[in-house]
């Protein structure tokens, strides 16, 4: 959360969608209900799995950015067995956030 003030929410889950960590920025109003949030995460995990089936031909996915009117959603690998799911304000610098998450994941892999 301290990475960028435009981050609304961060969730880390395994590749089956089991939530390992989740937090919202203080003062952020949820746009989705709890059930809708779980469904959105489930859809993102399933979409990531589908894309991963092509990795042997096109390479491993680095990230997916969904740009909506009210938020941006970033889904990307966090190590070999987890995904990070981040929502931001629309004006967020997603390239910076993606770069920082990639660096953090790499430092954890090398620890």
Annotate the PLM regions:
Residues 1-111:
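Non-catalytic interaction/Regulatory regions outside core domains
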């Amino acid at each position: 959360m301290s990475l960028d003030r435009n981050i609304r929410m961060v969730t880390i889950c395994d590749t089956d969608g089991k939530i390992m960590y989740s937090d919202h920025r203080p003062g952020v109003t949820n746009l989705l209900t709890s059930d809708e949030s779980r469904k959105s995460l489930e859809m993102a995990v399933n979409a990531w799995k589908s894309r991963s089936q092509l990795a042997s031909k096109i390479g491993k996915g680095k990230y997916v950015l969904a740009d909506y009117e009210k938020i941006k959603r970033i889904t990307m690998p966090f190590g070999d067995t987890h995904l990070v799911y981040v929502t931001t304000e629309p004006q967020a610098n997603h390239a910076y956030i993606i770069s920082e998450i990639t660096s953090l994941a790499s430092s954890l892999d090398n620890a």
